[in-house]
């Protein structure tokens, strides 16, 4: 995706990346997943956002970068969460990637997540392999070493196509049935907890 693609406001970007491919490369490995769940955080006036009240700290600096930069933060002291800066520089809106669907390298994803082969997983484990922000970061080996880097780099990027095991280009769909709901686990955000800024496809 080109730079301008990520300069949308947070809500538009959260919708636009649904159905696109999140691709992770490391140690000569390539993992392809499809983005199926996102949340928008709309900057300094959003009580659910880390930058509410224009709180610019060392932690939130990536959100003030131009759209298309990676913001990884830790929750509960152990789980990484992947976000993308949206809009333009110094407009700190972002998108949290909440869920992805594994497309390729299922064993690699499974080893990262559960330390066993994909064929050894229970139905419950398969269902829950990447359906949460901390889960997908563990499955894709996403950590804070990627913080502030471009989502258009070599290590982690978003694309509207990938190459299958036969070398054929597979493109994302343009027509999607996007669902909306309240964002998850932000009960502290007063009226903002009721905003319908969570987006997902089934």
Curated annotation (Swiss-Prot):
Keywords: DNA damage, DNA repair, Hydrolase. It holds the Pfam family Pur_DNA_glyco. Gene3D superfamilies: Methylpurine-DNA glycosylase (MPG). CDD domains: AAG (cd00540). InterPro entries: Formyl_transferase-like_C_sf (IPR011034), MPG (IPR003180), MPG_sf (IPR036995). GO terms for molecular function: alkylbase DNA N-glycosylase activity; DNA binding. The keyword Disulfide bond does not apply. It is an enzyme of class 3 (hydrolase). One of its GO terms (biological process) is base-excision repair. Its EC number is 3.2.2.-. Belongs to the DNA glycosylase MPG family. This is Putative 3-methyladenine DNA glycosylase. It comes from Clostridioides difficile (strain 630) (Peptoclostridium difficile). The lineage of its organism: Bacteria, Bacillati, Bacillota, Clostridia, Peptostreptococcales.
């Amino acid at each position: 995706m080109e730079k301008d693609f990520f300069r949308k406001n947070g809500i538009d970007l959260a919708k636009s990346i649904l159905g696109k491919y999140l691709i992770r490369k490391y140690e000569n490995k390539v993992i392809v997943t499809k983005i199926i769940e996102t949340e928008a955080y709309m900057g300094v006036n959003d009580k659910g956002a880390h930058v509410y009240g224009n709180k610019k700290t060392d932690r939130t600096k990536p959100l003030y970068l131009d759209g298309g930069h990676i913001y990884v933060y830790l929750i509960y002291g152990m789980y990484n969460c992947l976000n993308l800066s949206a809009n333009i520089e110094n407009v700190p809106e972002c998108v949290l990637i909440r869920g992805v669907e594994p497309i390729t390298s299922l064993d690699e994803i499974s080893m990262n997540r559960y330390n066993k082969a994909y064929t050894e997983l229970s139905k419950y484990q398969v269902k829950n392999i990447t359906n949460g922000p901390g889960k997908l970061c563990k499955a894709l080996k996403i950590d804070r070493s990627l913080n502030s880097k471009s989502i258009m780099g070599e290590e982690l990027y978003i694309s509207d196509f990938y190459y299958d095991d036969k070398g054929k280009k597979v493109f994302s769909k343009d027509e999607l049935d996007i669902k909306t709901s309240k964002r998850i686990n932000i009960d502290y955000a007063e009226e903002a907890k009721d905003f319908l800024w969570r987006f997902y496809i089934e």
